[in-house]
């Protein structure tokens, strides 16, 4: 019900329906977008004990999702990629370092979500949940 009202934001807060959405993203070969988005959400809400801990976490997100040829590389515009690289060099601006990329990826997820609600997998989810 929340998903019907809140769309993608509701889906991201769900449990079982989110599993169906992950299956859809896997079919589209784009589940790395969701994983990145969730990693950044966790990063932004985590209370780091030290600036170094925050920097290590930011570098981990970068090396997993943003670095060229990374395991789960997301598709970003070069200007967003460059801004992240520069921000990682300046440890004073780490809190919102991924914000432009997160916004971009959310838009990609939203496009996938609209394809999902038109798919047979959506109908299966509605029937089962």
How should these model regions be labeled?
Residues 1-129:
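Long, compositionally biased intrinsically disordered regulatory segments in eukaryotic proteins
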């Amino acid at each position: 019900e929340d998903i019907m009202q809140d769309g993608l934001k509701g889906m991201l807060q769900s449990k079982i329906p989110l599993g169906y959405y992950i299956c859809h993203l896997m079919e589209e070969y784009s589940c790395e977008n969701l994983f990145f988005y969730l990693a950044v959400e966790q990063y932004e809400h985590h209370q780091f004990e030290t600036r170094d801990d925050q920097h290590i976490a930011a570098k981990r997100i970068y090396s997993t999702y943003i670095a060229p040829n990374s395991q789960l590389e997301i598709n970003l515009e070069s200007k967003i990629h460059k801004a992240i690289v520069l921000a990682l060099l300046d440890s004073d601006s780490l809190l919102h370092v991924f914000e432009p990329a997160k916004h971009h990826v959310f838009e990609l997820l939203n496009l996938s979500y609209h394809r999902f609600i038109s798919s047979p997998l959506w109908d299966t989810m509605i029937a089962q949940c």
